[in-house]
Swiss-Prot record:
Listed Gene3D superfamilies: capsid protein of prophage domain, putative capsid protein of prophage domain like
GO cellular component, as recorded: host cell cytoplasm; viral capsid
Pfam families xref list: Phage_cap_E
Gene assigned in the entry: E
InterPro entries in alphabetical order: Major_capsid_GpE
Coiled-coil ranges (or none): 109-129
Described purpose of this protein according to its UniProt entry: Assembles to form an icosahedral capsid with a T=7 symmetry. The icosahedral capsid is about 60 nm in diameter and composed of 415 major capsid proteins. The assembly is primed by the interaction between capsid assembly protease and portal dodecamer, and major capsid proteins assemble cooperatively to form the procapsid with the help of capsid scaffolding protein. Major capsid protein forms hexons and pentons of the icosahedron. Viral genomic DNA is packaged into the procapsid through the portal vertex. The packaging triggers a dramatic reconfiguration of the capsid shell.
Domain of life of the organism encoding this protein: Viruses
Protein name according to UniProt: Major capsid protein
Length: 341
């Protein structure tokens, strides 16, 4: 038995629970929900012969010999779920005024909304993890509810994943005399288009700015109204805009996700990503596999939130948000990923 309507839940979820991860925000700006379980790449406007190479993962190992190229794919299904615990309605909420105690009805609403916030965040973290992995390596492992893990490979050229080593490692260079500009320009040649942004993790940024030449060339002045600088400024606690290095914006990303109750960084230590804010990243979604959604005429959607009461002894109440996300890069060579050393 439904409690809140889907329209109410969608409105609350959209207005109150914005999640603004960097890679999704600036590199994946097109959204394509499908009314079918599969995502059909041929139906996305402007794509020409895009295909994914999908390989099964057995015992943690990618078996490419059992994989194949496909232009249609069923995304993993995610549906974080919480119970609305009646005991929590008898307890004072953390921010509740002891002199003005709220009634259980108000507490129940607050608990439902907090559950939804947690569920939305869980899905958004999956989306950002896919987006970051697509940019870093051109592939990622797809997992989901009742879904055997597979590797989704978008076909990144080997030359676009660079590992510094030996004499080329920045850590071995003289910080007073060496200028890393030539290295960056050489790396950028591997990108399919023009590079207008570089994203570092905090340790990669610390290594880059340790060069005196960088200190001299980095323009940290504010006040530009350019579309690029507007796009990368003021994105929250996890993102720091450092300035312009020539005509390239420098951004440091310290975003994290939670896996098995452990916080992990989206970007590995000593990472540098060269890209363009006009790169065409796609947020695609398979249909919602829920009978209630079908009855309501909701199939092609990025989310399906629901709140319902399950009859029985005792009666139980739940919240859940469902989604089938698949983040894609039609041109994975628009980016160059560098492992600094």
């Amino acid at each position: 038995m439904s409690v809140y309507t889907t329209a109410q839940l969608l409105a609350v979820n959209e207005k109150k629970f914005k999640f603004d991860p960097l890679f999704l925000r600036i590199f994946f700006r097109e959204t394509y929900p499908f009314s079918t379980e599969k995502v059909y790449l041929s139906q996305i406007p402007g794509l020409v012969n895009m295909a994914l190479y999908v390989s099964p993962i057995v015992s943690g190992k990618v078996i490419r010999s059992r994989g194949g190229s496909t232009s249609e794919f069923t995304p993993g299904y995610v549906k974080p779920k919480h119970e609305v615990n009646p005991l929590m309605m008898t307890l004072r909420l953390p921010d509740e005024d002891p002199q003005n105690v709220a009634d259980p009805v108000y507490r129940r609403r607050r608990i439902i909304l907090q559950n939804m916030k947690d569920e939305e965040l869980a899905i958004a973290q999956v989306e950002e993890k896919q987006a970051v992995s697509a940019v870093l390596s051109g592939k990622y492992t797809m997992t989901g509810e009742a879904f055997e893990p597979v590797e989704v490979d978008m076909g990144r050229s080997a030359g676009n994943n660079i590992v510094q080593a030996g004499a080329a490692a920045w850590s071995t260079r003289d910080k007073e005399t060496y200028d890393p500009t030539d290295d960056i320009e050489a790396y950028a040649l591997n990108a399919r288009g023009v590079v207008n942004i570089i994203v570092f993790d905090p340790k990669g940024w610390a290594l880059f700015r340790s060069f005196k030449a960088v200190e001299k060339k980095l323009d940290t002045r504010r006040g530009s109204n350019s579309e690029l600088e507007t796009a990368v400024k003021d994105l929250g606690m996890a993102v720091s805009y450092k300035g312009m290095f020539g005509d390239v914006a420098i951004v440091v990303y310290s975003g994290q996700y939670v896996e098995n109750d452990v916080k992990k960084n989206y970007l590995p230590d000593l990472t540098m990503v060269l890209g363009n804010t006009q790169a065409r990243g796609l947020r695609t979604y398979g249909c919602i596999l829920d009978a209630d959604a079908q009855r309501e005429g909701i199939d092609a959607s990025t989310r399906y939130p629901k709140n319902w009461v399950q009859l029985g002894d005792p009666v139980r109440e739940f919240t859940m948000i469902q989604s089938a996300p698949l983040m894609l890069l039609p041109d994975p060579d628009a980016f160059v990923s560098v492992k600094l050393a």
